[in-house]
Amino acid sequence: MLPAADCYDNLLSRFAWDVPARYNIGVDVCDKWADGSGRLALIHETAQGDVSRVTFDDLRNVSNRFANSLARAGLQRGDRIAIFLAQGPETAIAHLAAYKLGAIAVPLFTLFGADALEYRLENSEAAALVTDAAGYEKIAPLRARLPALRTCYCIGDDAPDAPGVLRFDTALAAESPDFVPADTAADDPALIIYTSGTTGKPKGALHAHRVLLGHLPGVEMSQQCFPRDARLFWTPADWAWIGGLLDVLLPSWHHGVPVLARRFEKFDGEAAFALMARHGVTHAFLPPTALKLMRAVPAPRERYALALKSVASGGETLGTELTAWGRDALGVTINEFYGQTECNMVLSSCAALFDAQPGAIGKPVPGHAVAIVDEQGTPLPPGVEGRIAVRRPDPVMFVEYWRNPAATRDKFAGDYLLTGDTGTIDTDGFVRFVGRDDDVITSAGYRIGPGPIEDCLLTHPAVRMAAVVGVPDPTRTEIVKAFVVLNPGHVGDDALVQALQAHVRTRLAAHEYPRAIAFVDALPMTATGKIVRRALRDA
């Protein structure tokens, strides 16, 4: 997608979108590579250490069988198919079959509880669901309240014998490996991904098939001109998150690059390093939360034979401390990128094209018009704080919030999609993130973003993780409060509170240091690894 270029400005001037009128994700990422050559698509490692390899030929045949089974069960174009599985071959097969059928995939996190599942299944009116026995245990009590959910496919030998439940392998064995994919337009719906729900009920972001093409420039830029030097791509991010699905799995397969799948019941930094070394991972997307946990692993480059060529990170601000650690521990410069479920991968760093600026996310990815605007959607001059926004139309931009026209209207101001984040842009095009609209702290007339304070706290040897919020104060409107998870061997006493306050005060500014500090065992996180600051403010 990105043309060859030796610098960012050259790349920007030469880029042009090439989105065909007719386009299908399943055909693009699977069928075009299934030529009988046995080209490797997926390496799957189970929790027990068993490893299997899946080719594009395998994927085509099995996804065709599943598409035929779905059609036999009455699924049609536009119907929603929920996918409630962790990383693995069947998850990918379900996505491919849904796209080829012209249906709409609805990925769901395996960590979701009953309420989260029921809301999404009811809101999307999913007609079919693909899961395993553990997943179906959560679904079974809900089915009476989900009249649209007609058919459940269950993977594994322990699939329950229940009405409306089909055993996945048995159903597929009865079908033909030949299937004629739906002739979809690039603008036809393909995918609903629900937002994290950090500011209210989750909203279903409906994406068209073109969303994959819209992601490619950002993936290629954040991954050092991907697929250059790419042999194997991995992320711990669940494929139910836009970061796992559209930052890794589908873009990698668009380029014919194999992907590594491995489910972690609980992410472990040591195990992550061992996994990457064992399989020779060259490219990785590692969210900041994963990087913070990996930072606790001693001397990884000395202990593991890493083959990394590129690492990208996004979802939360990275910070200078993690960036510096990455250069030493991973042997690469971590490229930070920015986006959201509705409009992803629109800003990025790329060490191959330009040096990152401290505190900046990066520059607009070619093809995406990013600006800082006011509440009316009018672009603001460099250096003026405002709302980070993306001009429409844009191939990566969502179509609408599923059955929520009011929320869709509120997402835009004039020609711009409002991300809900505040920031600034400088004359060189670098965008700096200040915070979510509702995360910015107002204290004694100052507007304070939590990111730099959290980054500063992480440089203290006692701190493993930190989150900063504003809490009401009668004199200052708000004061800065930090919630801190300590590294082993440190005690959260008054002396450490004072040490951390001095640590921030002497490195940032007097008005930015945390006047209150609470030591906690863990931080509240969304299923995608983002800090839920609202929960901390309410604590």
Where in this protein do the model-derived segments appear?
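Structural core segment of the AMP-binding/adenylate-forming
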Residues: 72, 93-96, 100-170, 280, ...
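Conserved structural elements of the adenylate-forming
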Residues: 63-65, 173, 205-226, 291-295
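Gly/Ser/Thr-rich phosphate-binding loop
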Residues: 254, 281-286, 295-356, 369
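Conserved pre-ATP/AMP-binding loop-to-beta segment of ANL
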Residues: 38-40, 154, 172-194, 201, ...
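Conserved ATP/PPi-binding loop(s) of AMP-dependent carboxylate-activating enzymes
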Residues: 364-367, 378-410, 448
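AMP-binding/adenylate-forming catalytic core of the ANL superfamily
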Residues: 115-119, 127-132, 284, 392-394, ...
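Conserved AMP-binding A3 loop
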Residues: 52-57, 190-217
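Conserved AMP-binding/adenylation subdomain of ANL enzymes
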Residues: 213-235, 240-282, 297
